[in-house]
Amino acid sequence: MSTPTPTPTPITFPSATHTLSAHLYHHPPTNTTPTTLTPAIILSHPMTGVKEQTTTLYATHLHAAGFTTLTFDAAYQGSSTGTPRGLEDPFQRVEDIKAAVTYLSTSVPGVDSSRIGVVGICASGGYACFAAASDLRIRAVATVSAACVGGMCRCGGVGRGLREDGGVIGMSLEGARGERNGVNWDGEEAPKMFDAERVLQDGGEGGNVDSFFKAAAEYYGTERGRHERSTQRVPLQSYDRMVVYDSFAFMRLIAPRPVLMIAGEEAETLHYSEEAVRLAREPKELFVVKGMGHFDLYDRLEVSGPKLVRFFREALA
């Protein structure tokens, strides 16, 4: 018998000058447990994603295990405020996570502010690590299919390793310069990072990067992950922000708080998790899920879900 999916409480909270739209899955105090405090976990969505996709699946799974959980749309994205729509600002994304910690710590009855963890998925895996490095309120951090948007913009994509490419960097900066001096894209006019419909029609092409976007289209362009507010449109002025950002530069500062990085054995992004764990100090763990790729872990939780429960039960005890 399956457990019914809980109905979240829609809430908003501030992050810098923005108002973020969020869903709270709460275990509030009751008449029989008025002083009981529960640990809480923040779930942060992938680049071009929204809170109703993969983070909801992980939030409900962790909520069923006894945690209060919170999902939210990043500034400029989903139902949150900010223009240009779709802007990917890594430093604002990090602030959004810290703002979520503040909200849980100060505004949700029954949450133990000393036991707050974060799960970041894809690009948010990088943002979660960066936030934890400088925010001691985050007691534990876990990632699923982590990636670094800065690394992608400097090296030429997810499957190009960690070696920077001057030509790729130049293209990123030129695109941003042109947009800043020309069209002020809104959410409908900004270019798509990838066109899910076209990729699905064409069937993808060979090579690591192409296979990544084919798998992305199979998630974002089908019932698995399609959502009207997840448009994959990214203003070009995002790229000069991303080029100078490094998700994992300060991994060493997270210790002695624990780090768990979950990645698929077949994921083109696996090298990001490997490098991040190499840079981190104990306690740390790289957990590789056999037979799975990057996007498989977005909605196949049979291995990653229980692993996260075990990790946070120990880390937030």
Regions found by a protein language model. Name each.
Residues 1-36:
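N-terminal cap/lid segment of alpha/beta-hydrolase-fold proteins
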Residues 47-60, 74:
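The serine-hydrolase catalytic nucleophile loop
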Residues 54, 87-109:
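Alpha/beta-hydrolase active-site loop
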Residues 61-81:
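Conserved alpha/beta-hydrolase
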Residues 109-122:
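Alpha/beta-hydrolase fold nucleophile elbow
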Residues 129-218:
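Alpha/beta-hydrolase-fold enzymes
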Residues 261-263:
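Short beta-strand/loop motif that positions the catalytic acidic residue
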Residues 292-302:
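Catalytic histidine-centered segment of alpha/beta-hydrolase-like enzymes
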